[in-house]
Amino acid sequence: MYIEMIDETKQVSQEMMEQTIDLLNFAAKTIGKEDKEMAVTFVTNDRSHALNLEYRDTDRPTDVISLEYKPELPIAFSQEDLELDPDLAGMLQEFDAYIGELFISVDKAHEQAEAYGHSFEREMGFLAVHGFLHINGYDHYTPEEEKEMFTLQEEILTAYGLTRQ
């Protein structure tokens, strides 16, 4: 899976970025999404607050914002169009591959790691997997959805080696 990494905070180590990429690739393999593309941006609480207000109409910072890419209308071209412009077929594959982006608040990750008594690495991993599952259609609005999503995210984190301890 191709993952574009952006650190707006300038606080995320190269090792943490590599762990995030590795973990998301592991999660993608687990749910059969290895051929997809996404972006992860590490942000401050101020930026998280602004994004949360803009996209969720919630006036406070949050730990992770998941923006699933769902084109409203399918992009369709005729066979003739595709034959006349070979780059068009490649471009369509790229659109189909892009699943969305995550904005992870580094500030919130530090706060929550301390509050929950586990490592910053575990919290960053949790937020990445949680957001990744959201952009792949998982949610936790109902008890059934919550059980499915939370069980899967814990299985991924444990299998990867990021336990709560």
UniProtKB/Swiss-Prot annotation:
<keyword id="KW-0690">Ribosome biogenesis</keyword>
<dbReference type="Pfam" id="PF02130">
    <property type="entry name" value="YbeY"/>
</dbReference>
<keyword id="KW-0963">Cytoplasm</keyword>
<dbReference type="GO" id="GO:0006364">
    <property type="term" value="P:rRNA processing"/>
</dbReference>
<keyword id="KW-0255">Endonuclease</keyword>
<dbReference type="GO" id="GO:0008270">
    <property type="term" value="F:zinc ion binding"/>
</dbReference>
<dbReference type="GO" id="GO:0004222">
    <property type="term" value="F:metalloendopeptidase activity"/>
</dbReference>
<feature type="binding site">
    <location>
        <position position="134"/>
    </location>
    <ligand>
        <name>Zn(2+)</name>
    </ligand>
</feature>
<comment type="function">
    <text>Single strand-specific metallo-endoribonuclease involved in late-stage 70S ribosome quality control and in maturation of the 3' terminus of the 16S rRNA.</text>
</comment>
<keyword id="KW-0378">Hydrolase</keyword>
<keyword id="KW-0862">Zinc</keyword>
<feature type="binding site">
    <location>
        <position position="130"/>
    </location>
    <ligand>
        <name>Zn(2+)</name>
    </ligand>
</feature>
<dbReference type="InterPro" id="IPR002036">
    <property type="entry name" value="YbeY"/>
</dbReference>
<dbReference type="GO" id="GO:0004521">
    <property type="term" value="F:RNA endonuclease activity"/>
</dbReference>
<comment type="similarity">
    <text>Belongs to the endoribonuclease YbeY family.</text>
</comment>
<keyword id="KW-0479">Metal-binding</keyword>
<keyword id="KW-0698">rRNA processing</keyword>
<keyword id="KW-0540">Nuclease</keyword>
<dbReference type="GO" id="GO:0005737">
    <property type="term" value="C:cytoplasm"/>
</dbReference>
<dbReference type="InterPro" id="IPR023091">
    <property type="entry name" value="MetalPrtase_cat_dom_sf_prd"/>
</dbReference>
<feature type="binding site">
    <location>
        <position position="140"/>
    </location>
    <ligand>
        <name>Zn(2+)</name>
    </ligand>
</feature>
<protein>
    <recommendedName>
        <fullName>Endoribonuclease YbeY</fullName>
        <ecNumber>3.1.-.-</ecNumber>
    </recommendedName>
</protein>
<dbReference type="InterPro" id="IPR020549">
    <property type="entry name" value="YbeY_CS"/>
</dbReference>
